[in-house]
Amino acid sequence: MKNIIRELPYVLILGGVILIRTFIVTPVIVSGDSMKPNLHNGDLLLERKIGYNSTNIKRFDIVVIKEGKEEIIKRIIGLPGEHISYKNNKLYVNDKVLEENFDFRKTNDFNLEEICSCNSIPEGKYLVLGDNRPISKDSRMIGLIDEKDILGKAVYRIWPISKFGNIYN
């Protein structure tokens, strides 16, 4: 009985950590250079899972996505119902130029029809791009992303320490 009482705090702490990691926040490591210059290979991020769903997914959020057997980190560019295109390194949403207020690499021209053979992004789907556009494996190659495959939003960078803090979109 004394052993059970002595070990109970450890069991409760371990259970709490498992619950938090499973349902609230999860650490994720940036793999590759597709999000440069904003995120770098080896950066350690915290992904918020709880409360992140279709009602609060916003353009330019940095999200963790299940893509096959791996998790990838990309930026939300297109939302359901929108027509997206890039011309001369400018983002067009429903034929209007939209400023991207973050650092990204040159984007080759493309339009939504090349990605999904559709005029607008279907309900429950999102267009994502990496910030390092010339090398990123994103919606231009893998197609639109299902809402169910968006695991969470990257909210904090915890490594390297010199860049510790919120991830602003």
Regions found by a protein language model. Give the residues of each.
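Soluble "head" domains of membrane/secretory-pathway proteins
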Residues: 3-4, 11, 18-19, 23, ...
